[in-house]
Swiss-Prot record:
Protein's recorded name: Polyribonucleotide nucleotidyltransferase
Organism per entry: Rickettsia akari (strain Hartford)
Cofactor(s) the record lists: Mg(2+)
Gene name for this UniProt entry: pnp
Domain S1 motif: 623-691
Compositionally biased tracts (Low complexity): 699-712
Function field: Involved in mRNA degradation. Catalyzes the phosphorolysis of single-stranded polyribonucleotides processively in the 3'- to 5'-direction.
Length: 747
């Protein structure tokens, strides 16, 4: 019944198996990929006819992670997989980028590739298997897929490169890099790095490139045995058509490309396109040429003009040399109500960023095959149509926006402080208000500026730059800070972000074969120099984080309590914690390990909530000093309430240094006094003293005398040594910690 063909290879100690002919047999190409306990089905379908009137290749990649693959039922109200998650979108783009340039340029048939995770093994990189499976499925299909792609993941642990590291290993890795390519060339690189050098990044790419060569071999073997006949393709347009257009219109096209303004240049080129189509209207009606052929020939002429100017004259369409970077302008703090804001402008590309701080309750909950986790740092990239002067409606985030946002996220994430150093959730919203090339790298720059202005103690400023390439034969030119047209007509889009010390993110897409490591090395070095120049310009505005947070940033404190006390703080049905939140107007988040995070709009509200939590969860130490309230006066002494829920007794002999006749002559019900815990009686009740409590060095206000006052202040716990930033139970070897974020991070 089945004519199954299987090819396998041992890869990094595991067997990778590709098979076809058993599942999804009606698809033009279908491959099942197995490695460890991971199983993926990759199916490719190609329309029989070209799509009329379309000016691009309609390739769609869909990567899907089914919950059952990890033995789970989808969370939420609907127990079925819905729209693609950000992770699925990002992997779909990861598959698309190395594959798209390898189709015949004249091929415009609708093509769909679906990669479905059927079984998930966290020990194997399913995103890498999806790229391999998609490439194999297309190689079996009739689509004119000209070369075969494979991919690998590279980590860097203890100075050694690791092939296809597990999720657990990636937690300690200095690098998370995906590289894809053919037998001859690297086609795509995507990475996040912890301040690695250009040399380390290049070696990682080489390591990954060499590692996937055996995979290309077995895909070729599978395709040779099982593939279907390929579509026979003709040239994109007749050579005579291009010559005729050049003869009639090349002078006008060159004049248009001499215009430095993007909008003016685009308007002039659009008019020329209309003029050319009008000239060939009879040929279009007679079906001698199609609109697509004419447009393609025009684009080829435009490409020749742009590329020749660069290679022959070292001159770009805006007048710059290959290494020049456009003029830069930076501004910070322009949005008064935002916690942090910045505007970064580089030529005709501009990014406006706002930074907002939230509580741990505001962190993004992510449901994945590996389980649920929270993202503390969120970066949303927005590309409104007006940024390129297009009249279009605003829609849900596109795949491009998700991808660009994640690239900027990777660039910023390595330099952020950890949660102990900075306990806030951080959301960065980056709106591209103008775009003419490299808007994602402008987002990196503006995000770095906004975070520093907001007071986030980042390790170092970060900048990003997009590099391009024009290559003809052995002659090539690497372009710094590319324009949109240079990206479109060029051979490479190479984005590099990092600090002055090293790279934090790298993304490379190559459109041609033959880009060797010599070219990549030159591009990385040129990018380093460009990045340093941009950082110099940014540092003129702000070079390190502000020492204080803004006035409208919520105050926060984090303490740790015993796990056994969590239930007491929460109370039955959440009654206690709700009461604390309502009376203090604060937000409280309690982790399973006993970490309690308290957030409030000001310090007073924060203190009220914190006092109530400590009153419930913290056992006082002997020697601790508190503000207490006199609850009842007796002949022998007085009962004092402290920490809100705790009571102790002060004997008459412990009220004053001198002898007093009656307790009532000194204390009255409702008085606020300082008391020190001196011990417990045989029934466990607290014994307190008022004598010398105000003279103890631990008093928060040692100059204040312990006079009776009738103010209605909230009882406030105090510590024996206020100079020590310790928590309540440190003397008992507790791991309690308290972090107050209204402080200076830099001296």
């Amino acid at each position: 019944m089945f004519n199954e063909i299987t090819k396998s290879v041992t890869w990094n100690g595991k067997v990778l198996e590709l098979s076809t002919g058993k599942i999804a047999r009606q698809a033009d190409g279908a491959v099942t990929v197995k490695m460890g306990n991971s199983v993926l089905l990759c199916a490719a379908v190609v329309a029989n006819k070209a799509k009329e009137g379309i000016g691009f290749f309609p390739l769609t990649i869909n990567y899907r992670e089914m919950a059952y693959a990890a033995g789970k039922i989808p969370g939420g109200f609907f127990k079925r997989e819905g729209k693609a998650s950000d992770r699925e979108v990002l992997v779909s783009r990861l598959i698309d980028r190395p594959i798209r340039p390898l189709f015949h340029p004249a091929f415009v048939n609708e093509t769909h590739v679906t990669c479905t995770v059927l079984s998930y093994d966290p020990e194997t990189p399913v995103d890498i298997l999806a790229i391999i499976g998609a490439s194999a499925a297309l190689s079996l299909s009739p689509a004119p897929y000209l070369e075969i792609v494979a991919a690998s993941k590279v980590g860097l642990i203890d100075g050694e490169f690791v092939l296809n590291p597990t999720l657990e290993l990636l937690k300690t890795s200095q690098l998370d890099l995906v590289v894809a390519g053919t037998a001859d060339s690297v086609m795509m690189v995507e990475s996040e790095a912890n301040l690695l050098s250009e040399e380390q990044m290049l070696e990682a790419v080489k390591f990954g490139f060499e590692s996937f060569q055996p995979i290309i071999k077995i895909i070729k073997e599978l395709a040779k045995e099982a593939k279907k006949p390929k579509f026979q393709m003709q040239d994109l347009y007749p050579a005579s058509l291009k010559k005729e257009i050049e003869k009639l219109f090349v002078k006008e096209i060159k004049q248009a490309f001499a215009i430095k303004s993007k909008q003016e240049r685009s308007t002039n080129l659009d008019l020329i396109h209309e003029k050319v189509l009008t000239h060939f209207v009879s040929d279009i009606e007679n079906k001698k040429y199609s609109n697509y052929q004419i447009e393609s020939a025009l684009k080829s002429i435009e490409s020749d003009i742009l590329r020749n100017e660069i290679l022959e004259k070292n001159r770009r369409i805006d007048g710059r040399s290959t290494t020049d970077i456009r003029q830069i302008a930076c501004e910070i703090g322009l949005l008064p109500s935002a916690h942090g804001s910045a505007l970064f402008t580089r030529g005709e590309t501009q990014s406006l960023v706002s930074t907002t701080f939230g509580t741990s309750l505001d962190e993004q909950l992510v449901d994945s095959l590996d389980g649920e986790y929270k993202e503390r740092f969120m970066l949303d990239y927005i590309f409104p149509p007006y940024s390129v002067n297009e009249a279009m409606p605003m829609k849900a985030p596109s795949r491009r926006e998700v991808g660009h946002g994640k690239l900027a996220w990777r660039a910023i994430n390595p330099i952020l402080p950890n949660k102990v150093q900075f306990p806030y959730a951080i959301r960065v919203v980056a709106e591209t208000t103008e775009s003419n090339g490299s808007s994602s790298m402008a987002t990196v720059c503006s995000s770095s500026l906004a975070l520093m202005y907001a007071g986030v103690p980042i390790k170092a400023p970060v900048a990003g730059i997009a590099m391009g390439l024009v290559k003809e034969g052995k002659k090539f030119a690497v372009l710094s800070d590319i324009l949109g047209d240079e990206d479109y007509f060029g051979d490479m889009d190479f984005k590099v972000a990092g600090t002055s010390e090293g790279i934090t993110a790298l993304q490379m897409d190559i459109k041609i074969s033959g880009v060797d490591f010599k070219i990549m090395k030159a591009a990385l070095e040129q990018a380093r120099l460009g990045r340093l120049h941009i950082l110099d310009q940014m540092n003129k505005i702000i070079s390190k984080p502000n020492s204080k947070l803004g006035k409208n940033v919520p105050s926060t404190t984090t303490i740790k309590i015993d796990k056994d006390k969590i239930r007491d703080v929460i109370g039955p049905g959440g009654k206690v914690i709700k009461e604390i939140c309502e009376t203090s107007d604060a937000k409280i988040d309690i982790s399973d390990d006993g970490t309690v995070s308290v957030y409030a709009s000001d310090r007073d509200k924060l203190k009220v909530a914190l006092d109530k939590i400590k009153a419930i969860a913290v056992e006082p130490e002997i020697g601790e000093i508190f503000n207490g309230t006199v609850m009842k006066v007796l002949d022998s002494g007085a009962f004092i309430n402290y920490l809100g829920t705790k009571d102790g007794f002060v004997h008459i002999s412990e009220i004053a240094e001198e002898r007093i006749e009656t307790v009532g002559s000194v204390l009255k019900q409702g008085d606020i006094v300082k008391v020190k815990l001196i011990g417990f009686d045989n029934k466990g009740k607290a014994k307190l003293t008022i004598k010398n409590a105000d003279k103890d060095k631990s008093s928060n206000n040692p100059k204040q005398k312990n006079n009776v006052n009738n103010s209605k202040e909230n009882s406030e716990p105090e510590r024996r040594d206020s100079s020590k930033k310790r928590a309540w139970n440190e003397d008992n070897n507790s791991d309690t910690t308290e972090v107050i974020t209204e402080r200076k991070y830099f001296n």
